[in-house]
Amino acid sequence: MHKKLPFLKVDGTRIVNEAGRPVRLKGVNLGGWLMMEGYMLFGRNIPEKAFKEQFEKALGREALEDFTRSFRDTFIREEDIRTIKSWGANCIRIPFNYRLIEFEDQPFSLNEEGLRYLNRAVDWCEKYGIYCILDMHAAPGAQNPGWHSDCYGHQELFSNEFNKDRYLRLWRFLAEQYKDSSAVAGYDVLNEPVLPFTNEAALKDLYVKATKEIRDADTKHIIFLEGNFWAQRLASLGRPEDPNTAYSIHTYAPYDFTHNFKIGLYYPGRAYSIIWNKKRFEMLAKPYRMFMEHNDVPLYMGEFGVNARDGHFGEVKWVEDMLSVFKDNGISWTYWTYKTVANYAFPDGVYRYLDNPPWVNRQGPIYGWETYASLWPREKGRMIFSWRTENFTLNKKLYAVLEKGFAEKK
């Protein structure tokens, strides 16, 4: 058991501990665990709820509950938190689906079985002396049209008062739940919101209300607010009304390179008729640095990541340059993501599953998690075992760069 972590707070453009010492958060995301995503299991990017509806239709409610419990118990375990701590990281971002803690068909209910996993993760972080950030990755009604907000392309959080009430009530509950846990660095209250630029005031209004709900229960933890348009536009947020607030941004630029959507792109190199290199990222960081200083607020890069191609296309150099820019600008960061089934596209994990059993089935035509329902009755044991990190392979080149970043004192 590690010594109890001190609470963190915001001090101008820095995050500091209770003694006033600066703490730059550096770590990884636990993507795909409490908010499942298709590509991370070598599947199509359909909403998690669509996958589960198909699974239940094929095998029934009891089998779905058995699958869900088995996956959550296995994909991330205590050993994983210990491993991340051993790397030298000091923070883990934990994305979760609101459906983890509220039954969709029972608004304002509490799913105690789901909450147990968040509690367990926080307890592990306390045990090993590493901070965590709780990230609501999918909110009631959905905050963006992406599969990763668990919707079918239509977000209905901002336009629906009932969904907003559910969202606010959930954050009030979570703040009550974790107000005394110093291992929680803070609350990332809404992942990658998307609103028309003409309606960005609606995002700030929701953030003001969420902050009030949290502060009525918890005055200690940092509140992380993400900008509009996939956590990129901060201007409309202005200076935070609550002094213990940090702003969060995400980047996967250039998108076709980091996601391997266009064959033959290199880093440094040209994409969209622009040369992408460290100098360009330094230039792109300047407005964010000015925003930090003008509004006296810290910045946190909650997500950045790249599809691994064994380093042959400059992807490791991309990560290296990103970390250098973050360091020079005092930006905290968490890499996306800790582990995935190796895929041809989308950002990979530091750990990758390289095998090709029937439930991966890279050759298709049905592959990844859409094979699960047909295989679960006879392959359950092997599938569960395959999800353990010991069966994944460490991307040593990527890990070496991240480890160096974790070790930096600044």
Task: Please place each PLM-identified region on the residue numbering.
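N-terminal carbohydrate-binding accessory modules
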Residues: M1-A89, G405
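Active-site region of glycoside hydrolase catalytic domains
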Residues: K3-D11, N17, K127, A142-W276, ...
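Glycan-binding loop/region signatures in secreted carbohydrate-active enzymes
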Residues: L30-D73, S248, A253-A285, F291-M292, ...
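Feature marks short, surface-exposed loop/turn motifs that line or immediately flank catalytic pockets
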Residues: G32-L34, Y98-E102, P140-A142, P193, ...
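Aromatic- and acidic-residue-enriched segments that line the glycan-binding/catalytic groove
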Residues: E37-E48, F108-E113, P140-E161, P240-A246, ...
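Substrate-binding cleft and catalytic face of glycoside hydrolase catalytic domains
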Residues: E56-R61, D73-Y178, A183, N191-E192
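Alpha-helix-centered segments that form part of catalytic cores
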Residues: G60-A89, W276-P287, L299, G381, ...
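Aromatic-rich peripheral "rim/lid" segments of glycoside hydrolase catalytic domains that contact
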Residues: G311-K410
